[in-house]
Amino acid sequence: MDSPCTSESIYNLIPSDLKEPPQHPRYTSLFRATIKNDMKKFKTAMKTMGPAKVEIPSPKDFLKKHSKEKTLPPKKKFNRCSPKKPAVPLRTDHPVMGIQSGKNFINTNAADVIMGVAKKPKPIYVDKRTGDKHDLETSGLFPKYINKKDYGITPEYICKRNEDVKKAQEEYDNYIQENLKKAAMKRLSDEEREAVLQGLKKNWEEVHKEFQSLSVFIDSVPKKIRKQKLEKEMKQLEHDISVIEKHKIIYIANK
């Protein structure tokens, strides 16, 4: 059995120089150049700290004497041929006083008030005891729209739009009929369309039932391939069902 003092040695008493571990390399961001370019876009010279990027003045444009002083505008020549303004009245001139009109303003104003149409008060309603007033027309309490002459009648623009849709459908049907003769296309009837739709839904239910019966753990390649195949079939069936449900009129080509 080893003694407990085997690790002790006299050489351990010799002082040794402690070596500092080397420093890790300084972190440098990979986006440093991108950030610098972005900062240069939004910064302007003479507005932020740092060396201002201004144009170096030319030695020829040195500062001259009186170059900073404001210059007077050019002197305009007085034109004596322009028309003169009327003279200022003298102090001795007095305006004509005592001119009166024969119009009776009192009777005229009274007649205007009597013959004028009385101002109708604005219809309002009060919903609180403190006198909170609101407009009656815009409140919805007054039957305004149901009393109109055209209430309940289909607007003209909707009738026009329906006619345009009907006309476009007729033109499309005529175009399809022409192509039917050329390409021998066949239109699916409502019964055939419903039968195809029900068949697709039935196929989807069968594939979905088979998909639900898969094991929880997919731990082999064949299981994974089978699961992907079932998912692809279900996705294709869902796409076909949505297309048939969305389009009421379907044409097929006779091969």
Swiss-Prot record:
Residues 176-187 form the IQ domain. The keyword Cytoplasm applies. Keywords: Calmodulin-binding, Cell projection, Cilium, Cytoplasm, Cytoskeleton, Flagellum, SH3-binding. Residues 160-255 are annotated as: Interaction with TRPC proteins. GO terms for cellular component: 9+0 motile cilium; 9+2 motile cilium; acrosomal vesicle; axonemal B tubule inner sheath; axonemal microtubule; sperm flagellum; sperm principal piece. GO terms for biological process: establishment of left/right asymmetry; flagellated sperm motility. GO terms for molecular function: calmodulin binding; SH3 domain binding. The keyword Electron transport does not apply. It comes from the Eukaryota. A motif (SH3-binding) lies at residues 83-89. Residues 1-10 have a biased composition (Polar residues). Pfam families: Enkurin. High expression in testis and vomeronasal organ and lower expression in ovary, heart, lung, and brain. Not expressed in other tissues. Residues 160-252 form the Enkurin domain. Its main location: cytoplasm. Microtubule inner protein component of sperm flagellar doublet microtubules. Binds calmodulin via its IQ domain. Interacts with TRPC1, TRPC2, TRPC5, but not TRPC3. Interacts with CFAP45. The IQ motif is involved in calmodulin binding. This is Enkurin. The lineage of its organism: Eukaryota, Metazoa, Chordata, Craniata, Vertebrata. The gene is Enkur.
